From Swiss-Prot:
Superkingdom classification of source: Bacteria
The entry's keywords: Ribonucleoprotein, Ribosomal protein, RNA-binding, rRNA-binding
Entry protein name: Small ribosomal subunit protein uS8
Signal sequence bounds: none
Subunit composition and interactions: Part of the 30S ribosomal subunit. Contacts proteins S5 and S12.
Organism: Clostridium perfringens (strain 13 / Type A)
Family annotation (SUPFAM superfamilies): Ribosomal protein S8 (SSF56047)
Family stated for the protein in its record: Belongs to the universal ribosomal protein uS8 family.
Amino acid sequence: MVMTDPIADLLTRVRNANSVRHEVVEVPSSSVKKAIVNILLQEGYLKGVEEYNDGVVPMMRLTLKYGANNERVITGLKRISKPGLRVYCKKDEVPRVLNGLGIALISTSKGLVVDREARKLGLGGEVICYVW
């Protein structure tokens, strides 16, 4: 089956696993998904990532992170730029998620970066998603 938006599929799998408090979620791997997952890991939204090859499709096993009383670290995930409606921002219009409590992932000429880094580097680009 052909997937029209693999990034939305990744975000939906993480959102669904998080909502039912699963410890682990498995997603098909790609270079863009690896970049997104690495940023989520660096920002403290995921506990761990393991890559493996399941024969046909390379996969990633994501370990979700929860707080002390089993509260969710990821409160929300929202896909912004979609295949049918791309959303771009200029360097002066980089979005701020929940007044800095969340992050916006932006695809720039320097690769995938977080909104803080895009502001610091003076870069605009395609707004991939919000995480809070």
